[in-house]
Regions:
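Membrane-proximal helix-turn-helix segments that form the acceptor-binding/catalytic region
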Residues: 198-206
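Active-site-proximal loop/hinge segments that shape catalytic or ion-binding/gating pockets
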Residues: 439
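ATP-dependent carboxylate-amine ligase catalytic core
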Residues: 8, 30-36, 41-52, 77-172
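Short functional linear segments
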Residues: 1-60, 67-69, 73-78
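Nucleotide phosphate-binding/pyrophosphate-handling subdomain across enzymes
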Residues: 150, 155-160, 167-178, 182-186, ...
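Extended acidic/charged loop-beta regions that coordinate divalent cations
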Residues: 88, 92, 143-189, 222-257
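C-terminal helical cap/extension that packs against the catalytic core
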Residues: 216-237, 246, 318-320, 327, ...
Length: 451
């Protein structure tokens, strides 16, 4: 083992972020290294660790992380030790790899990879990381695969980073592939139409491995998945067509009490329950029972440590954050916020919003709730769009569409934006709601303000 210290660990992590392209410091286009050759070699160097446990592979535009975490929580309830690999992280990159041990009390929460393990892994393979010219995501993928094997997990639920066909996670051969909802995002890398993006996601479908498709895919998108499944001789299940065995008796119960809040989780829940049906058929030894499974899914956030999805940060005033950042995700989120005002759940709405410069703001501006007070902000990443630019484009859009932009402000950093939102809520009185979102980076910088 290499000599470990907290100081050495922090220095090494900082150097890894600088040496290898990641979306924390460069654009997706710069960070994304398509192709599986590097990962195949790295995986072999690590001893093909993913072959030592069974896997579920998840791709999709939105809902991957929630689906992965619910599924892992349900599998752990069968008495299994389950790894979860998701991205991005919010506060600590070790959040990307977690283990839920169903043989322990659920109150213990998940285990994160230790700093010592990360340090030893990175120092041990330091020369290989440079030789193979890996991306940051490829490094963390290898780290997760190896850690799961060393910790002797029974199953691991693996989420793709971007796309599917050429994603570094696509070296695994899973028991089940899952594709969540499809939307327009990262079009410069994945394609400009839903069909093109679906084709990239369909790349995770392996020969003879069943696939569950979630969301409500348009016919042209469903056709892409059916065609690929046919080529791979894989059984395909559309979650919105079948009636999952636990849906009728347990879906309402789960949704009412689930700690992963947000109306969009109902669609993810249906995908998870359909996936559990398929897994139960493949592996009858899995004890997927009604109430036990329902309660495990209901407490997904606590059991798996999954955060940033319609998460309440404060109750005085109410503050909700969500990392949804593309038009498809924000359509759902903003509709739910409008619903709160329509039914008088809240008397006013204040939105702290920041966005990355590579997002198509023209597709998002029409979705903005018109009764909100807006506080535009700039998170600390070179990828961010400046708050002043968001404000200027919002003003222009409002002028062209007969809306007022008077209730909109600019804060150059997230902490100041949160402070202004709280002051504004106090001035409004009544029962205000603060929503923080638009980007993972905004949420990650806002969360410490409430801890």
């Amino acid at each position: 083992m290499s000599s470990f210290s907290e100081e050495k660990y922090n220095e090494l992590i900082q150097s890894i972020f600088l040496r290898f392209p990641s979306v924390q410091n460069v654009s997706f286009g710069e960070a994304y290294k398509p192709g599986l050759e590097r990962m195949e070699e790295f995986r072999e160097l690590l001893g093909n660790p993913d072959g030592r446990y069974r896997t579920v592979h998840i791709a999709g535009t939105n809902g991957k992380g929630s689906t992965a975490s619910m599924l892992a929580s349900a599998l752990a309830a069968c008495g299994l030790k389950v790894g979860i690999y998701t991205s991005p992280h919010i506060l600590d990159f070790r959040e990307r790899m977690r283990i839920v041990d169903g043989r322990k009390s659920s109150a213990d929460g998940p285990s994160l990879v230790t700093e010592e393990y990360v340090y030893d892994f990175l120092t041990r393979y330091n020369d290989d990381l440079d030789r193979l010219q890996l991306s940051f995501f490829e490094i963390t993928t290898g780290l997760a695969f190896k850690w799961f094997a060393d910790m002797e997990v029974d199953w691991a639920v693996i989420e793709t980073g971007l796309g599917g066909r050429l994603d570094s996670t696509n070296v695994i051969t899973p028991e089940l592939s899952v594709i969540t909802s499809i939307g327009l995002d990262h079009c410069d890398l994945l394609g400009n139409t839903l069909e093109e993006i679906a084709a990239e996601k369909a790349g995770i479908i392996k020969k003879g491995v069943p696939v569950v498709v979630g969301g409500h895919p348009a016919e042209e998108v469903a056709a892409v998945f059916r065609k690929k499944a046919g080529e791979m001789q894989s059984r395909i299940v559309f979650a919105d067509v079948v009636q999952p065995s636990l849906w009728k008796d347990h879906s309402s119960f789960i949704m009412e009490g689930m700690d992963l809040r947000g109306g969009y989780q109902e669609m993810n829940l249906r995908t998870v329950l359909a996936s559990l049906d398929v897994l139960g058929q493949l592996s009858p030894e899995l004890r997927i029972t009604g109430m036990e499974t329902a309660e495990a899914i209901m407490h997904t956030a606590v059991r798996t440590g999954f955060h940033g999805r319609w998460e309440r940060l404060s109750s005085c005033p109410d503050v909700i954050c969500d990392i949804g950042h593309n038009a498809a995700a924000l359509t759902n989120n903003f509709a739910q916020l409008n619903g709160y005002l329509d039914n008088d759940t809240y008397s006013s709405l204040i939105i702290v919003y920041g966005v990355m410069a590579d997002k198509n703001l023209e597709d998002i501006l029409p979705l903005f709730p018109d009764r909100a007070t807006w506080i535009f902000t700039t998170p600390h990443t070179r990828r961010a769009m400046q708050a002043s630019e968001i404000k200027a484009r919002y003003d222009e859009w409002c002028s062209s569409n007969g809306r007022s932009s008077a209730m909109s402000y600019v804060c150059d950093d997230v902490r100041s934006a949160v402070a202004l939102a709280i002051r504004t809520a106090g001035q409004f009185g009544g029962n205000p709601l603060i929503y923080i979102g638009g980007s993972t980076f905004v949420v990650s910088e806002a969360m410490p303000c409430f801890r």
